[in-house]
């Protein structure tokens, strides 16, 4: 895969128009134009949407029906019922919540009104249902769009070659400065050589993250698939667009003979219980050493499934074959995505809730198991999990030893900056993206360097840095990985793939040696030819995320070395 693809479709932000300004107040006589799914809404005379103060009011029946809902007024309950094949919403007139499919409730800003025997609801009613809404105060034009139609429209403009229209109509001023029409065109057209002709966009999924709608779908091309992720603000403005290789199915494997697996619960009795899998040798005598596997970044399952890999499955089985019990579990943000990645949580969500607390609970679970030796519980953390391992240990994990798999003692934003610059440096000087994106990345770097000067409240309100919430990064750097690691006197094994382009063998591996130089129990192993997931790959697309899409397993030598190291500590 060309590195140009990785850059424009992963690093570039493609944005629509300006943001909301201060609310504009109008009388109730002002009428707003209205569209549904990019089509003008046709309504009977006298039934148009209107602006009441700073609230846009829309006739619920024609809008709901245009969106494909059956809309019914239940007189006995003074309620509105909106039904589709899959969803049902009930709104009691005069209330401030919408009941979804008889279960959850959605908060609603404003209340319905009756005008000329028609029920009007605030535009925010449809936003609460997960639809995309907008209002242009200068033209008095409002809109409601389903996430599927929005995504289809964006990719449709790209596929039709209407780059200038997309740029003129949908980009905001800042993104027009960063991404030219020619850069947009070259980014989309660069897909053709590797993935072929665009075919269709599959059904989308959505979630709310820090006030924005994140839409994900698989885009099918004639030679392969790509995952498309777009991010939309609260005025239907596109704030992000990226394409990444869609994952092929991971290598299917059966549990090896001589092993057994049990389903357990990490954090049982807490507000966030997590499904876990404990892998054990089927026949053993005496108490066993054990390992907690701690995930990298992102919302991942107990196998740490990423693209076409299942690294935690491979490690768990390989270690259990060496007489070591292994606990792996679903990440909290994987099990409770809306709770931990939604609007309200995003500003205060940190690695403590995402990773640290659950790893400590997992260690406690192993220490209580009578089949296992409580004095020989180890942590093996991959990527972000490796970075956080010293903190998890210090905050209560109290492990017998730590295995750091492709971790780093540096700040997270430093690594993200290097990852982006690595892609930029690989571009031809003639590529217009090179200068434009370098400028954008340098701007993000300036924001990152300013994090330490912000108060907690300022960080919670600050814009994202490299697409990561500012407070998340600030809180993480307040628990300095290098400083915590310097205090370690227990056994530590640092493992690094030489071909890792996410954590750099030439930078991070030597830094670990420097940080741990006073720890005589620290050991270091580097593996030629292995990538970030400790998979050996040298085919097409090597050095880009394309290689992660080729199904494979963790190199057996890595797992053998892990097991030998743990058993050596145990024998002592």
List PLM regions with ranges.
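Alpha/beta-hydrolase active-site loop
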Residues: 347-369
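Accessory cap/linker subdomain of secreted extracellular hydrolases
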Residues: 401-487
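Short beta-strand/loop motif that positions the catalytic acidic residue
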Residues: 488, 494-496
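N-terminal cap/lid segment of alpha/beta-hydrolase-fold proteins
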Residues: 247-286
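Short solvent-exposed beta->alpha transition segments
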Residues: 164-212
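Short beta-strand element of the alpha/beta-hydrolase
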Residues: 286-296
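Primary recognition of N-terminal secretory signal peptides and signal-anchoring hydrophobic helices
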Residues: 4-6, 18-149
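Cap/lid segment of the alpha/beta-hydrolase catalytic domain
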Residues: 294-353, 424, 536-547
């Amino acid at each position: 895969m060309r590195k140009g693809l990785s850059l424009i479709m992963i690093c570039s932000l493609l944005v629509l128009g300006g943001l909301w300004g201060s609310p504009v107040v109008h009388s109730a006589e002002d009428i707003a134009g209205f569209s549904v799914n990019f089509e003008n809404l046709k309504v009977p005379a006298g039934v148009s949407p209107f602006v009441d103060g700073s609230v846009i009011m829309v006739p619920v029946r024609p809008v709901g029906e245009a969106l494909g809902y059956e809309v019914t007024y239940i007189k006995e309950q003074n309620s509105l019922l909106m039904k589709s094949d899959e969803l049902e919403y009930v709104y009691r007139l005069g209330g401030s919540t919408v009941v979804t499919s008889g279960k959850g409730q959605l908060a609603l800003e404003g209340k319905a009104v009756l005008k000329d025997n028609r029920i009007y609801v605030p535009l925010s009613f449809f936003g609460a249902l997960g639809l995309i809404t907008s209002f242009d105060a200068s033209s008095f034009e409002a809109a409601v769009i389903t996430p599927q139609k929005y995504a289809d429209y964006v990719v449709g403009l790209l596929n039709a070659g209407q780059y200038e229209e997309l740029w003129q109509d949908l980009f905001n001023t800042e993104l027009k400065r960063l991404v030219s029409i020619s850069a947009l065109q070259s980014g989309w057209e660069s897909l053709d050589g590797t993935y072929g002709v665009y075919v269709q966009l599959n059904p989308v999924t959505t979630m709310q993250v820090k006030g924005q709608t994140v839409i994900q779908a698989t885009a099918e091309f004639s030679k392969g698939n790509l995952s498309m992720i777009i991010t939309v603000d609260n005025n239907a403005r596109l704030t992000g667009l990226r394409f990444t290789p869609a994952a092929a199915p991971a290598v299917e494997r059966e549990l090896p003979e001589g092993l057994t697996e049990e389903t357990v619960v990490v954090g049982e009795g807490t507000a966030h219980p997590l499904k876990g899998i404990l892998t054990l040798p089927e026949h053993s005598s005496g108490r066993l050493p054990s390992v907690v596997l701690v995930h990298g970044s992102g919302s991942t399952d107990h196998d740490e499934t990423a693209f076409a890999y299942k690294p935690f499955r491979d490690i768990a089985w390989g270690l259990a074959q060496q007489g070591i019990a292994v606990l792996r579990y679903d990440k909290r943000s994987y099990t409770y995505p809306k709770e931990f990645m939604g609007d309200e949580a995003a500003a205060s969500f940190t690695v403590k809730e995402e990773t640290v607390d659950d790893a400590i609970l997992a260690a406690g679970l192993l220490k209580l198991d009578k089949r296992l030796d409580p004095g020989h519980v180890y942590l093996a953390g991959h990527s972000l999990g490796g970075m956080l391992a010293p903190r998890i240990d210090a905050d209560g994990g109290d492990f017998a030893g730590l295995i750091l798999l492709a971790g780093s003692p540096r700040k997270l934003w430093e690594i993200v900056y290097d990852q982006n610059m690595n892609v930029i440096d690989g571009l031809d000087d003639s590529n217009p993206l090179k200068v434009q994106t370098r400028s954008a990345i340098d701007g993000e770097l300036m924001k990152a360097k300013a994090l330490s000067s912000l108060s907690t409240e300022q960080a919670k309100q600050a814009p994202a840095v490299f697409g990561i919430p500012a407070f998340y990064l600030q809180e993480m750097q307040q628990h300095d990985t290098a400083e915590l690691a310097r205090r370690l006197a227990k056994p530590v094994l640092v493992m690094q793939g030489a071909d890792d382009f996410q954590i750099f063998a030439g930078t991070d591996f030597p830094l670990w040696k420097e940080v741990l130089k006073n720890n005589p129990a620290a050991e270091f192993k580097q593996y030629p030819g292995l990538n970030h997931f400790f998979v050996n790959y040298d085919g097409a697309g090597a050095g880009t995320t394309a290689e992660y899409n080729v199904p494979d397993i963790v190199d057996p030598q890595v797992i053998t070395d892990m097991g030998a190291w743990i058993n050596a500590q145990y024998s002592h």
